[in-house]
Amino acid sequence: MQRVLLASKIHRATVTQADLHYVGSITIDAELMAAADIVEGEQVHVVDITSGARLVTYAITGTPGSGVIGINGAAAHLISPGNLVIIMSFVHLDEAERADHRANVVHVDADNHIVTIGSDPAQPVPGAADQLVGRV
């Protein structure tokens, strides 16, 4: 049996642009993609913390170091510049693979620059006063 587990998460990124007339997808700074181990064309889930919108799309590589998080195509109706989002990818693993699996969790600052890289998906962004630890 295979299970679908979190592979990576870019946590609390700020949307920098939205282009309704682009063909689709989400543009992500190449440095963030590398840190999260997300590759161009990979399916990603986007959760908008600000509006509650959720969608599935694919990743397009943005300029390294730019901090770009661009919502493209019809998704621009749901997610706006300035909104905070969580970008996640998932992996199918069998039981043997699951034992050693650790997600890549990338925390970013307000400019979408990397603050920390870890493996605990319940860990809040370090120093963020408005977040609760996901484990009790």
Swiss-Prot record:
Is synthesized initially as an inactive proenzyme, which is activated by self-cleavage at a specific serine bond to produce a beta-subunit with a hydroxyl group at its C-terminus and an alpha-subunit with a pyruvoyl group at its N-terminus. Pathway: Cofactor biosynthesis; (R)-pantothenate biosynthesis; beta-alanine from L-aspartate: step 1/1. Heterooctamer of four alpha and four beta subunits. Its cofactor is pyruvate. InterPro entries: Asp_de-COase-like_dom_sf, Asp_decarbox. It catalyses: L-aspartate + H(+) = beta-alanine + CO2. The active site is at 25 (schiff-base intermediate with substrate), 58 (proton donor). Its main location: cytoplasm. Keywords: Autocatalytic cleavage, Cytoplasm, Decarboxylase, Lyase, Pantothenate biosynthesis, Pyruvate, Schiff base, Zymogen. The modification Pyruvic acid (Ser) is found at residue 25. Substrate binds at residues 57, 73-75. It comes from Mycolicibacterium smegmatis (strain ATCC 700084 / mc(2)155). It is an enzyme of class 4 (lyase). Its EC number is 4.1.1.11. NCBIfam families: panD. Transmembrane segments: none annotated. CDD domains: Asp_decarbox. It comes from the Bacteria. The keyword Lyase applies. The gene is panD. One of its GO terms (cellular component) is cytosol. This is Aspartate 1-decarboxylase.
